Amino acid sequence: MAVQKIIITPILVFLVTIFFNVSSSSSSNNSQYQFLNHGVRSAYWPAGDDFSPSLIDTNYFTHILLAFIQPEPISFKLEITKSGIKWGQNFIKALRHRSPPVKTLLSIGGGGSNSTLFSEIASTKQNREIFINSTIEVARKYRFDGVDLDWEFPETQQDMFNLGLLYEEWYNALFAEAKVRRKPRLLLTSAVYYNSTVRLIGKHGPRSYPTQAINKYLDWASPMCFDYHGTWDNNTDFNAALYDSKSEISTNFGLHSWIKSGVRPEKLVMGLALYGRAWELKDPNVNGVGAEAVGPATDTDGSMNYNEILKFNKQSGANVVYDKVAISFYSYAGTTWIGYDDGPSITTKVRFAKSLGLKGYFFWALGKDKDWSISKQASNAWGH
């Protein structure tokens, strides 16, 4: 998931203190976890996004994750600066009196963050303790309900082993802190690779997640079931196919790999993408899945949010195809080809997740579905 730096300032203390005085009933042990009884319907809000958090319709979500804050490279404590105060205040104000209420988590890391830094943090007990204590301090100070780690990605099997130690010590610290302060324990979650084994090209080869630690210490893990294909490929393909008979790169394979690895289904929250990937076709007359492409069709990396895709399809009169085998959409017009998800594919994926006994799903990211049509269909499919 794309990294954006979160900034927290002391000025927010007053705002969030008011919030939790007004909402003191949410501090009970029962209310902290009542959201988990009927599943998790969550989404990330990218820090500094031009989509105001005041526009978030909480009817469709149980948890909102604020993304992202980074650890400092020397102290290993969470980085807190004086900039970014405006969006920070807006986030707190927007969610403090919402009905229905949502739980908020502070997410650490993100795509493009420093994987080597996380490796160093996780490598020793002292480093882990400094980092963990900082996360608890910040989360409590600004009244979050939990913390989320998005380490993309551990690069060695030793990293994975150390990640398991980090989960264990983090959970134990959260449990002890909650007991001392007589408060509900902060939630602990982690965004992970779509597969239980990371097979990204690298000198260290495949490495598997610490599944026992995930079962024992996380409230849930969130496989990122997207970014399977993109403009780094020379041929068009789906961003987040549910099924792929030609390879292991699919949500079906990934989620089953997690379950086969020993992670209990109720510990998994499936990732969904509110964006697609756009290619420039080499030949506009060759426009199916697997067509040759010459690069991204946009000025960025080919990423287009759901609203932009709908606008493109309408304005260009694009041909829209629902692949009922892959359970994903693509559209094409001229030399532009886009792979993405729409209502029917999202609905099928959510029902698939529920059939596996998963805890829920999450979206990356809020602001890309401004009319809430996809969010609503996902929530309905979950049975809320």
Curated annotation (Swiss-Prot):
Could you confirm whether the keyword Glycoprotein appears in this record?
yes
Q: Name one Pfam family in it.
A: Glyco_hydro_18
GO MF terms listed in the record are:
chitin binding; chitinase activity; endochitinase activity
Catalytic positions are: E152 (proton donor)
Question: What is this enzyme's EC?
Answer: 3.2.1.14
**Domain GH18, first and last residues per copy:** 39-384
Superkingdom in the source lineage: Eukaryota
Keyword line: Carbohydrate metabolism, Chitin degradation, Glycoprotein, Glycosidase, Hydrolase, Plant defense, Polysaccharide degradation, Signal
What InterPro entries does the database record attribute to this sequence?
Chitinase_II/V-like_cat, Chitinase_insertion_sf, Glyco_hydro18_cat, Glyco_hydro_18_chit_AS, Glycoside_hydrolase_SF, Glycosyl_Hydrlase_18
Glycosylated at which positions? N29, N114, N133, N195, N234
Q: Name one GO biological process term.
A: chitin catabolic process
Q: Which reaction is recorded as catalysed by this protein?
A: Random endo-hydrolysis of N-acetyl-beta-D-glucosaminide (1->4)-beta-linkages in chitin and chitodextrins
Q: Check the UniProt entry and state the signal peptide residues, or none.
A: 1-27
**Pathway the protein contributes to:** Glycan degradation; chitin degradation
Purpose of the protein: Possesses chitinase activity in vitro toward glycol chitin, carboxymethyl-chitin, colloidal chitin, and the chitin oligosaccharides (N-acetylglucosamine) (GlcNAc)6 and (GlcNAc)5. Hydrolyzes (GlcNAc)6 into (GlcNAc)4 and (GlcNAc)2, or two (GlcNAc)3 molecules. Has the capacity to inhibit hyphal growth of the fungus Trichoderma viride in an agar-plate bioassay.
Please give the family membership noted in the entry. Belongs to the glycosyl hydrolase 18 family. Chitinase class V subfamily.
This protein is called Class V chitinase CHIT5a
Q: Which organism is it from?
A: Medicago truncatula
Its gene name is: CHIT5A
